[in-house]
Amino acid sequence: YEIGVRLVGSEMCIRDRRMAIEADSTFGEPYATAGMKGLAAARAIGLLSYRGPEGYDLSQQDENDDFSSHRACTYQQYQGEKLCRRYNAYSYYKILNAFDTHDVGYQRGGVAAALQRITAECLVVGISTDLIFTVPEMQALHRMLPRSTYHQIDSPFGHDGFLVEHEQLNRILNPFIHPTHE
């Protein structure tokens, strides 16, 4: 499980966008714009796990038979270009590496021992279709944290559900942030 802790094998495959960056023949060259085609491809790959199939079906439907101008394809291209304006391939590569190798249990007696040290009240939110932080992983995190509450958001938008389903999220967050003491 990842849960901000470590990655399961299937998640490592989904998140390994570094391969796309490394496949760009300019990556490794000593200039800031090197690896940009790979960066755009990495973003497109990442989007598939952020949004998920249901979210794409709802937001990117198209009657057009021309694959190259299909809404889903042009959306992927646009998002790749947008990321290239904000990052360079080297910084994104380093961020991906940090995400993929983070393990809160490292040198802390393992994941469970590290999480048991947390004394704060925690809120864990799962999203029904999230492929990055799955519901079983979020439920496992909830069980490992000594003082946590679990809620679930139902959304067809995968990991992006936390951005799209703001009304559901607000109903969960507001009582946690502003508790009423009776």
Where are these regions (language model features)?
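Feature representing long, continuous alpha-helical segments
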Residues: 90-97, 171
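Active-site nucleophile elbow and catalytic-triad environment of alpha/beta-hydrolase enzymes
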Residues: 78-79, 94-114
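Flexible loop/turn segments at secondary-structure boundaries
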Residues: 10, 101-103, 131-134, 158-161
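Single conserved hydrophobic/aromatic residue that forms the stacking wall/gate
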Residues: 1-9, 13
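Catalytic active-site module of serine/aspartate enzymes centered on a nucleophile-bearing elbow/loop
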Residues: 139-140, 147-182
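Short beta-strand/loop motif that positions the catalytic acidic residue
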Residues: 118, 124-126
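Alpha/beta-hydrolase-fold enzymes
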Residues: 10-82
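Short alpha-helix in the alpha/beta-hydrolase fold that links the catalytic acid
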Residues: 107-111, 120, 131-143
